[in-house]
């Protein structure tokens, strides 16, 4: 049976990795985003998910069988996050309804399903770790829940199957991405080396000492494709991480070693990147000009607010992947190597020296 993919948010960390895998596996792929880039063997579509008319125009004549929603829009409050991001999912699925071609829809959310939204991140009564998919929703407004509800409603209405994927912090390469820890840390390390500044962990003592995990964008892509093509996995949510665990006190030294730095001891007080990097844009521009880098605007590369939110959590964050493992998903990625692979790509693309 013919299978055609529509990847929504294909220019982001998650969407670009998925698009690459689908093309590699021989799928016809259409990539939809507001500003689609050129990717080999991919048909680009430009549309605004917040504009139903824009979607109707862009999707006219399209016949995707599998839809992968890998994007979201950050707003000033959780109320606005809910309003905007739920509408984006609803608008997309409403626009696709007349095609009658959609057999499966995938939605990527994340661990805020268990931790709560940015407005109430890691606060209140949280489920015990490791997080499992059968743990219920928190009693708090959360745009992930609103997105899921739009997906479930459309699936019941239109008869397609679905999956929800909940990664931890995702590592990958995408310039201008809203949540990009690996690139943020690469830029931070480069600035520290250039200025001779200590390479200081920006997060909480709990994160420094506790076990945790992460998600390589390639690992997430593999799980999305596996679930979308495995009937036993249909109509289910899955956690997805690399398959290993680590402590940041170890990972910080591994990252420092990659950049030829010495990892500083844990600081006497919390040292968020938004504070540490507040005045670094001119330094980065100088580094970029000296080394012939492609992006002199530091703010196009880094997302310190997101890295601070992840590394500043006052609780342990570990994820259970038994559910997908029992159904046959066995992919694995060492988390330190996932960082190194991103750093290597950034160097190859002349984004860091």
Model regions and ranges:
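N-terminal Rossmann NAD(P)H-binding glycine-rich loop of SDR-like oxidoreductase domains
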Residues: 3-27
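Conserved glycine-rich Rossmann-like NAD(P)H-binding loop of the short-chain dehydrogenase/reductase
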Residues: 27-36
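Conserved Rossmann-fold NAD(P)-dependent oxidoreductase catalytic core, especially the SDR/UDP-sugar
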Residues: 87-143
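Active-site Tyr-X1-5-Lys
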Residues: 134-168, 173
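Glycine/proline-rich active-site loop of Rossmann-fold NAD(P)-dependent oxidoreductases
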Residues: 158, 172-188, 218, 227-238, ...
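A conserved pocket-lining segment of Rossmann-fold NAD(P)-dependent short-chain dehydrogenase/reductase
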Residues: 187-215
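Mid/C-terminal beta-alpha module of Rossmann-like enzyme folds, strongest
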Residues: 220-308, 320-322, 326, 343, ...
């Amino acid at each position: 049976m013919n299978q055609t993919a529509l990847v929504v948010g294909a220019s982001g960390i998650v969407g670009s990795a998925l698009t690459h895998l689908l093309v590699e596996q021989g799928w016809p792929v259409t990539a939809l985003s507001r500003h689609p880039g050129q990717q080999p063997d991919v048909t680009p579509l430009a549309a605004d998910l917040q504009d139903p008319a824009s979607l109707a125009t862009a999707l006219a004549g399209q016949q995707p069988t599998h839809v992968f929603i890998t994007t979201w829009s950050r707003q000033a409050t959780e109320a606005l996050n809910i309003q905007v991001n739920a509408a984006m999912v609803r608008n997309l699925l409403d626009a696709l309804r007349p095609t009658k071609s959609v057999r499966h829809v995938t939605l990527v959310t994340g661990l805020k399903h268990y931790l709560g939204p940015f407005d109430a991140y890691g606060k209140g009564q949280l489920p015990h770790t490791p997080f499992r998919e059968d743990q219920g929703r928190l009693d708090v407004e959360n745009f992930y829940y609103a997105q899921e509800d739009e997906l479930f409603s459309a699936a019941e209405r239109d008869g397609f199957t679905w999956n929800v994927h909940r990664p931890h912090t995702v590592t990958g390469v995408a310039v201008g991405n809203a949540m990009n820890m690996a690139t943020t840390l690469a830029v931070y390390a480069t600035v520290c080396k250039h200025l001779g500044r200590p390479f200081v962990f920006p997060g909480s003592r709990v994160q420094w000492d506790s076990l945790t995990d992460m998600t390589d964008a390639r690992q997430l892509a593999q799980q999305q494709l596996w679930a979308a093509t495995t009937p036993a996995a249909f109509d289910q949510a899955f956690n997805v991480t690399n398959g290993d665990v680590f402590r940041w006190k170890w990972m910080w030294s591994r990252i420092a070693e990659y950049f030829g730095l010495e990892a500083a001891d844990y600081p006497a007080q919390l040292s968020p990147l938004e504070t540490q990097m507040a005045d670094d844009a001119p330094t980065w521009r100088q580094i970029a000009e000296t080394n012939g880098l492609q992006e002199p605007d530091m703010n196009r590369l880094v997302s310190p607010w997101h890295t601070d939110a992840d590394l500043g959590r006052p609780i342990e964050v570990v994820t259970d992947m038994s559910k997908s493992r029992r159904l046959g998903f066995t992919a694995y990625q060492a988390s330190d190597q996932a960082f190194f692979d991103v750093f290597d790509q950034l160097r190859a693309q002349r984004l860091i020296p």
